């Protein structure tokens, strides 16, 4: 499309029609007698796109795969989107559902403190970190 300033919608429509027909004709063999019909068809098609028809969309709220209460088990968390069981939901939500934990909590009306990690898994990781000495201040070397 050219970089000209358009006065109104009709000028834009004519400009777009010309650009589309020119691009089409440069790559296809079109007899001269069919050119007015092609221009008319493209113009008509573009005219129909300027006023979108109003469509009433009735979207039902998605139902969770399991109840929120049953989704948090000691050894796993069940994804409300697909019903899969996981120790940690964050990576699954990102890769399979393109959601952040915040978006997930908002979609399913979950509490801000709804866990993204199974309780037993969180406890095991915490225990391992404490055994390694993480979270403690270093002793001064003197």
Swiss-Prot record:
UniProt entry keywords in alphabetical sequence:
DNA-binding, Metal-binding, Transcription, Transcription regulation, Zinc, Zinc-finger
Q: Which GO terms describe its biological process?
A: regulation of DNA-templated transcription
Q: Which GO terms describe its molecular function?
A: DNA binding; zinc ion binding
Q: Name the source's superkingdom.
A: Bacteria
Q: Where are the zinc fingers (C2H3-type)?
A: 79-97
Which InterPro entries does the record associate with it? ROS/MUCR_sf, ROS_MUCR
Asked whether the keyword Zinc-finger is assigned, the reply is: yes
Q: Which Pfam families match?
A: ROS_MUCR
Report the sequence similarity comment from the record.
Answer: Belongs to the ros/MucR family.
- What name does this protein carry? Transcriptional regulatory protein rosAr
Q: Specify the species.
A: Rhizobium radiobacter
């Amino acid at each position: 499309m050219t970089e000209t300033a358009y006065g109104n919608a009709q000028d834009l429509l004519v400009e777009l029609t010309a650009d589309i027909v020119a691009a089409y004709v440069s790559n296809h063999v079109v007899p001269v007698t069919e050119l007015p019909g092609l221009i008319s068809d493209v113009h008509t098609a573009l005219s129909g796109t300027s006023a979108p028809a109003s469509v009433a969309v009735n979207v039902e709220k998605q139902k969770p795969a399991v109840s929120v209460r049953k989704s948090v088990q000691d050894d796993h968390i069940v994804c409300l989107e697909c019903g899969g069981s996981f120790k940690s939901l964050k990576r699954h939500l990102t890769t399979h559902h393109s959601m952040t934990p915040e978006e997930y909590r908002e979609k399913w009306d979950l509490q801000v403190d709804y866990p993204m990690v199974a309780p037993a898994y969180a406890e095991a990781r915490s225990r391992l970190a404490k055994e390694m000495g993480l979270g403690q201040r270093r002793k001064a070397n003197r």
